[in-house]
Amino acid sequence: MKKINTFAALLLMAAAAMFSTSCENDNINPYDYVNNGGNGSEGNENQGSKDVITTKVAEYPKGSLVWSKDTTLSESVEIPVGTSLYIEPGVTVTCRSEVQVPVEIVVLGNLYCLGTAEKPVTITSDTKKPADWGGIICGYNSEEVVLNHVDVAYAGATPTESSASFQNKLFKTTIDGGVPAFHFCNVNGKFVMANSFFHDNYNDQTYFTGGNGLIINNIFADSGNAADGGEAINVKAGCKLDVANNRS
């Protein structure tokens, strides 16, 4: 447990240090990096940047994806193994609901949502209704995820056979009540979920089937649906977690 606390502290300290850097660059178009090889404007193969990326917030290593501006998703985004997606403070990611296949953020690599108290990261939907989109679904090889000062809302849609979560064998189409808003399953992976607000999600707010993590200072509200109340923190075997100061 002490090792996990050290990991969490180092990640959050690193995030704070990054915020002191000042550079410039435009945001990467998310559609350059979508779904199994990508069909972006330049035929990007969904492996992140070939060069160091600098923004007004920080400098990111090669192989990164960086969202520094508000982003609207009309299809799922898949972050490949070995690639890291960084979402900067104050960014709002809006998932469209009127789509044939529910939008999902499937993290096979790493995800760092680096919000602050003043500028949280928001992941929401366009119509603000539960089950408008799927959720943040991490794969079996996802190594690290940080959700710090993140507002996650209106997730919980049921996947189809065309969904990225189904294609990667993470969830079935017969799941009861839709996918959770955040799912982590790598027993050797690490995650931090801190200072975040999960609300109005159709199924469980979070669901863990593996991993070493810290869950601290989060708020969970309006979980589940009329048939199934949903759980704030649903933990199964294969997890080693420190959980403290959460409210629901």
Sequence positions of predicted segments:
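C-terminal motif of bacterial Sec signal peptides marking the signal peptidase cleavage site
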Residues: F19-S22
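Hydrophobic helical h-region of N-terminal Sec-dependent signal peptides
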Residues: A9-A17
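Bacterial N-terminal signal peptides that target proteins for export
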Residues: M1-A9
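Beta-strand/loop edge motif enriched in small/polar residues
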Residues: E24-S248
